[in-house]
């Protein structure tokens, strides 16, 4: 499951970067990540950074999250967050836009783990089954998460028990996800 998830993420990343190249003539670009150090940075101009995915250089685990909550995480979630450094990538699944949360740098990896811990603590306080977010949506009240019990990818409404299965696994989500370029500059 780990290798399959990592490969599916690499494949989606390649499709995403290829689309950027096709539409703009250059690698993915981001204004939000401008000025933030990362091994992904290829070049910068006056207000944006051009980037490409890079190999993950830290220990490939989410041990800090597991220790903080005394929980074993779905191996696919660990693979998703520890396969590469990259900027967040947008795509559509069945017409629904989403943005995959990615790790931009070693420092960002700490922030992502802290946010995962916060999300799991919230789920525990609400007496809900544990989930781990992997993508955002246009709505601040909904996220794309992985059910830590089943491994299914779900659209969940934060603070409620409302959830909808959208893929049987992260791998299947990434295979079905179509790259989407939101702001493409030439």
Swiss-Prot record:
Keywords: Cell inner membrane, Cell membrane, Membrane. It holds the Pfam family Syd. Its main location: membrane. It is a peripheral membrane protein. InterPro entries: Syd, Syd_sf. CDD domains: Syd. It is found in: Cell inner membrane. GO terms for cellular component: cytoplasmic side of plasma membrane. It comes from the Bacteria. Interacts with the SecY protein in vivo. May bind preferentially to an uncomplexed state of SecY, thus functioning either as a chelating agent for excess SecY in the cell or as a regulatory factor that negatively controls the translocase function. Belongs to the Syd family. This is Protein Syd. It comes from Erwinia tasmaniensis (strain DSM 17950 / CFBP 7177 / CIP 109463 / NCPPB 4357 / Et1/99).
